[in-house]
Amino acid sequence: MKEEGFIHLCQPDSGKSCGACCGLYNYADSTRESLVDRLRNRTRIFRETVKKANDPKVFLNRIRSIESPERIYDTIHCCEYLGFLDDEEKRVGCLLHPLQNDGEDMRDLSFYGRELCAGHICPSYHFISRDEKLSLTRIVDDWYLYGLCITDIDLVKEYFRFISEGICEVPRYERFEGRLKDIALDFFSLKISWPFRSTDANRFGKYYFDGSQYMISHIDYDHLGYERSRFDKIFLSLTSSFRTPDELREGEEIIRKNIEEFISCYKTDAIL
């Protein structure tokens, strides 16, 4: 049973959605450009192919014959029925869903089946607070970045912890507009643009993978001659790999400046 005021993180509004639980970011090449091409092609073929009950299987075989199956983590299934739900390509989601097929629910044909797909709730629903959910859905308007961030619990929790400590309160989600929204968006956009991101193909956030096994990565601060950074959880979420002490210091400065800019702007706006 869903709690009162339930926030649907999978499809929060008409401008974005998340497909992470469908394996969207588990492809070896999960860049925006690659995923857009993959989803766009699937959506087109699905619309052209699926007209009756057995057609989804024809679609599935065709997609598997033309797409690269390479994955980061072997155990996570990448669902071929994930595509764009709208012509503007703002929202990703299940092409088998009844809302995409004139009321006919075809999700039993998927790998996990209708019941699991319809009822799955990811850990972010439980560990990210209501205020954080409302704020993040207001900050990020893009499906690609939104999916990367809403599923990264450490990144979300740590950022809101630092800014909340700085302003001595939990920021109200309504405040995330104008300059405050831009500053917060700059931070979460580091998920894509972080200059110290590891180039290892088997890294994803704080995890690294070896076939069907996964482990949590660590930053070797002893090798860098540093104590553990107060931004360590953020660094791991950003898939960081620092080669020198100077790179670590620069990384800390990027995070520190963003947090301090947000705090200063928030306090200034509160006075006006």
Predicted segments with their positions:
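Charged, glycine/proline-rich intrinsically disordered loops and linkers
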Residues: 34-69
